[in-house]
């Protein structure tokens, strides 16, 4: 009885709620030493929050946002609908038209707050991406082949991958594959035999993933056919909303209308059954500023958009917001940032933060527009990005590393990609656990080691509970590593006893990772780089 009364008092003290017309306003004051993560899935603010920010409406803008926050003091904030939020530095002000939003006490740690919120509001449903996405790279040839990649170009690209000594994986078909944008039918002009091309790529060892968007060309036959049937998102003045994206300016389907959703879902099912397509890369980023005009609103639109992958475990999303369950697909964060050293630092931080917000299978990629002038990019940036990608749940490759002119960097890139398969079994284990428990695959150190001074550590992370990853994020081959309590073993068998802060040098651009020694034993030691440079023999490092 005493504990319940105390909790009730705290809620009143730290969350004052008042009804203003149709809006609910809640102020959440920070507890002593409390740090918060949330709201911005990518490209928003450094986390945990430090600097104040002005009022932000989560239902508007292009950035990827979520009405979910967690704190290192065991509290969380969650809403099924977007809200507006302001941060003063010592309190949050949340305004919502959908109902009261408050801070809920779920325990004492970041992990407890995250897991309680997940299981209460969007529990794991037992679904997860295909293991094949974890063990082989995903190649996106948009940069080299352009928007309208042809059958010949795609098959030639697959041959280049294999000829260069890279493993087969998943090949993404850019969004211009349709006969008319919005038809969801292959172009006979680009593909003489679409099903035959898919079979040929399968024979080479590749899986095929189609880029799918909600867009419809404003001057095409699909738009003219459906314009009078309220199939598209419209502005309040009844004019059709036109969004800018890679294909120009286009209308887009209103998936919150049941008949529209069923139409698109049926087309995607037909692409799989009629042509042998393995999965889809869903991209609705250009539509984000206008989703608030959808019949059901922005949250309902993104929820229905996320449901298009139901029944297919071979999918990626660039933007999504499912609220009925834990995300069960690969979430591909595309950062709108120049491809440079700062991009790498932001990618590492955003990737770990996204794992704290209900996206356990998150990867980070640069936008293609940021890769337009590759000749000016330091070759080591490519190398470091591939190293970082190699420890993500899915290894996405958005450029052709076999075309890098620096021979040493090119050789290192190929070794990294080929050695990715060594992590496959461990990732399968993590994904199998995550789909049942909701545990993130990549974990913030504060999540795994609470109250040990890691709240501000955003350039290291845990891969499950076994591996500490300290990615190299600049041109140097060494970096400062913060070791938690315990014994940590590197690829050479060297041990580090934590807590410890020390500089570690990576030999020959090896990925810096360390396995936690449990009861004097090392279970995995599946490193990305442990091939002997002298004779090419694979050596397993012992303890």
Predicted regions and their residues:
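Sec-dependent N-terminal signal peptides
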Residues: 2-17
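Leucine-biased recognition of intrinsically disordered, low-complexity hydrophobic segments
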Residues: 7, 19-20, 512, 528
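C-terminal beta-strand-rich structural cap/linker in extracellular carbohydrate-active enzymes
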Residues: 498-537, 542-543
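A generic signature of intrinsically disordered, low-complexity regions enriched in glycine/proline
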Residues: 6, 258, 287, 494, ...
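Short, intrinsically disordered, low-complexity terminal segments
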Residues: 2-3, 19, 503, 523
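Catalytic-domain carbohydrate-binding cleft regions of carbohydrate-active enzymes
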Residues: 23-509, 529-531
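Short, Lys/Arg-enriched, disordered terminal segments
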Residues: 1-6, 22, 538-543
